[in-house]
């Protein structure tokens, strides 16, 4: 029988529910339980694929090609699981399924309503995600904040689940406790009100995790307990720490797993956290520093590239180095020649993924600077494509070379739309997505990085290297070190360079704290040498 932990949020969004879910998942899995985590997003988009990164942060791609919420990245990194499309449930997907079933006559003439049809669909999607993994414990994060109108059907669905699974389900409420510096007080009133709102809906939290600058003192816990009907022992602190990866450790210091085991009637087991603790210690005690420039078009919101940032941290911990990240807005490089000076003192340059024409020439300038100055370079997805454009312009002499994504009428279409994309009109969910096989060429940098004849990495793109130019690129010294099963260029590199690698894939999605991405590990190793 699967046990369920439902995590809700109060007071404001972005209070850290995703990190809490991931941390609890890690602790339970390291205790020996089979765990899965599910993110519920109440927005009407079917998935996150068409959202602007400034609005929603990065799109996290799963092995099966789902474009999902970035919280699934937290789940994968912390818990060490591979999620699927079933681990992200959106209101758009729920309503889409309900309307489809109504049109197909699946409801046999009933009046289709929020209760029971929408709530039943939500519960069915949760069950599907759980059944797919045979999870012993499923942690479900309800996105948004208690009181949001769009979240009400999801809260009603989990309220019904509690009725059906009385002994097998618990609620954890995560809410902000603000610290007033002027008076030196922790203010609990907003948290109290958010719990009151939950109780009006019919949900009584079993545990509260208070997000605050400082740990909660015992008096504050007793005050919260009095107004929320939650025992003081079940009120925990998620206070400010240096690293997100410390959150599981501070929760376990407060005996969170014992409390969960007790509430759900599970056999108590001790979580094994020694390796995780070593990882955290390595991050906090580096032996030297490495400065990495990240060149992209969404750098004002760092969460737009969250998995890349975390992949750097994973590799840095393994190497015992401190990464200083220099965020460079690619469009700024186009404004003045002086802007390129930002790259002079860095130890490595990563050109980040991103669609569209804005900032493209700035990215190309950064690539040229890395290539000509022998600075370790990594180009990811669009970053790889633009590395080829730069090479075509400045080495092959094809000055008007471009990608047809930017200039459909370019004289030299070095990057062009994938053949199977040319007749596609629909935007959402239609790219080349998910884990794809890459065949590596022996004797290359890519082969030495992975130490394998073939690998699987996740993808998210519509454009490819134009096969008509592959021979010419190789003639002028570019190495095609990885190709797909049907011959698409997947990885490129250059000889006589410290480290110059472009990959069509997104290796950051599979990086984990205890098993860093080989690409980032090797890049950072060279950059920090």
Swiss-Prot record:
Region spans: Amidoligase domain: 1-266
SUPFAM superfamilies referenced in this protein's UniProt entry, alphabetically: Class I glutamine amidotransferase-like (SSF52317), P-loop containing nucleoside triphosphate hydrolases (SSF52540)
Domain of life per record: Archaea
Description of activity control: Allosterically activated by GTP, when glutamine is the substrate; GTP has no effect on the reaction when ammonia is the substrate. The allosteric effector GTP functions by stabilizing the protein conformation that binds the tetrahedral intermediate(s) formed during glutamine hydrolysis. Inhibited by the product CTP, via allosteric rather than competitive inhibition.
Cysteine pairs bridged by disulfides in the record: none
Binding residues for UTP: 13, 187-192, 223
Catalytic class of the enzyme: ligase
Amino acids binding ATP: 14-19, 71
Active-site residue numbers: 381 (nucleophile), 506, 508
Sites where the protein binds CTP: 13, 148-150, 187-192, 223
GO biological process: 'de novo' CTP biosynthetic process; pyrimidine nucleobase biosynthetic process
An example molecular function term from Gene Ontology annotations: identical protein binding
UniProt keyword list: ATP-binding, Glutamine amidotransferase, Ligase, Magnesium, Metal-binding, Nucleotide-binding, Pyrimidine biosynthesis
Ligand binding (L-glutamine): 54, 354, 382-385, 405, 462
Reactions catalysed according to its record: UTP + L-glutamine + ATP + H2O = CTP + L-glutamate + ADP + phosphate + 2 H(+); L-glutamine + H2O = L-glutamate + NH4(+); UTP + NH4(+) + ATP = CTP + ADP + phosphate + 2 H(+)
Amino acids binding Mg(2+): 71, 141
Pfam families assigned: CTP_synth_N, GATase
Record's keyword annotation contains Calcium: no
EC number: 6.3.4.2
InterPro entries: Class_I_gatase-like, CTP_synthase, CTP_synthase_N, GATASE, GATase1_CTP_Synthase, P-loop_NTPase
The protein's role, per its UniProt record: Catalyzes the ATP-dependent amination of UTP to CTP with either L-glutamine or ammonia as the source of nitrogen. Regulates intracellular CTP levels through interactions with the four ribonucleotide triphosphates.
NCBIfam families noted in UniProt: PRK05380.1 (NF003792), PyrG (TIGR00337)
Quaternary data: Homotetramer.
Protein name as it appears in the record: CTP synthase
């Amino acid at each position: 029988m699967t046990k369920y932990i439902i995590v809700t949020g109060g007071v404001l969004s972005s209070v850290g529910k995703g990190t809490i879910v991931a941390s609890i998942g890690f602790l339970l899995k390291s205790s020996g339980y089979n765990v899965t985590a599910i993110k519920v997003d109440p927005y009407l988009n079917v998935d996150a694929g068409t959202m602007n990164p400034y609005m929603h942060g990065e799109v996290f791609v799963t092995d099966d090609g789902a474009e999902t919420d970035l919280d699934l990245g937290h789940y994968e990194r912390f818990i060490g699981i591979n999620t699927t499309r079933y681990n992200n449930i959106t209101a758009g997907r729920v309503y889409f399924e309900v309307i489809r079933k109504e049109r197909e006559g699946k409801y046999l003439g009933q009046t289709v309503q929020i209760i029971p049809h929408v709530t039943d669909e939500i519960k069915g999607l949760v069950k599907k995600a759980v059944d797919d993994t045979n999870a012993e414990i499923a942690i479900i994060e309800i996105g948004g904040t208690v009181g949001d109108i769009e979240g009400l059907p999801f809260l009603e669905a989990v309220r019904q689940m509690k009725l059906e699974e009385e002994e097998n389900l618990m609620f954890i409420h995560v809410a902000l406790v603000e610290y007033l510096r002027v008076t030196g007080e922790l203010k609990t009133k907003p948290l109290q009100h958010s719990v009151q709102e939950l109780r009006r809906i019919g949900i009584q939290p079993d545990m509260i995790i208070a997000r605050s600058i400082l740990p909660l003192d015992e008096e504050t816990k007793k005050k919260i307990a009095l107004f929320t009907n939650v025992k003081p022992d079940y009120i925990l602190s998620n206070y400010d720490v240096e690293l997100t990866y410390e959150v599981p450790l501070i929760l376990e210091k407060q005996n969170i797993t014992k409390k969960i085991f007790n509430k759900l009637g599970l056999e108590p087991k001790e979580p094994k956290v020694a390796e995780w603790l070593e990882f955290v210690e390595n991050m906090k005690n580096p032996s030297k520093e490495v400065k990495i420039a990240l060149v992209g078009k969404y750098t004002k919101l760092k969460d737009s590239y969250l998995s890349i940032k975390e992949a750097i941290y994973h590799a840095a911990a393994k190497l015992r180095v401190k990464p200083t990240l220099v965020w460079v807005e690619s469009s700024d490089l186009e404004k003045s020649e002086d802007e390129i000076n930002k790259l002079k003192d860095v130890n490595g340059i990563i050109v980040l993924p991103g669609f569209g024409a804005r900032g493209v020439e700035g990215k190309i300038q950064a690539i040229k600077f890395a290539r000509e100055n022998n600075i370790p370079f990594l180009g990811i997805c669009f970053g790889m494509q633009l590395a080829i454009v730069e090479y075509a312009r400045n080495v092959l002499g094809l000055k008007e070379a471009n990608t047809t994504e930017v200039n459909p009428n370019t004289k030299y279409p070095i990057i062009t739309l994938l053949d199977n994309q040319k007749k596609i009109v629909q935007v959402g969910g239609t790219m080349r997505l998910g884990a794809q096989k890459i065949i590596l060429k022996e004797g290359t940098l890519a082969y030495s990085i992975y130490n394998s004849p073939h690998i699987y990495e996740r993808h998210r793109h519509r454009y490819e290297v134009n096969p008509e130019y592959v021979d010419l690129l190789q003639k002028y010294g570019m190495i095609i070190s990885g190709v797909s099963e049907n011959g698409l260029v997947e990885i490129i590199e250059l000889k006589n360079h410290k480290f110059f690698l472009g990959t069509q894939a997104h290796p950051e999605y599979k990086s984990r704290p205890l098993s860093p991405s080989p690409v980032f590990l090797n890049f950072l190793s060279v950059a920090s040498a």
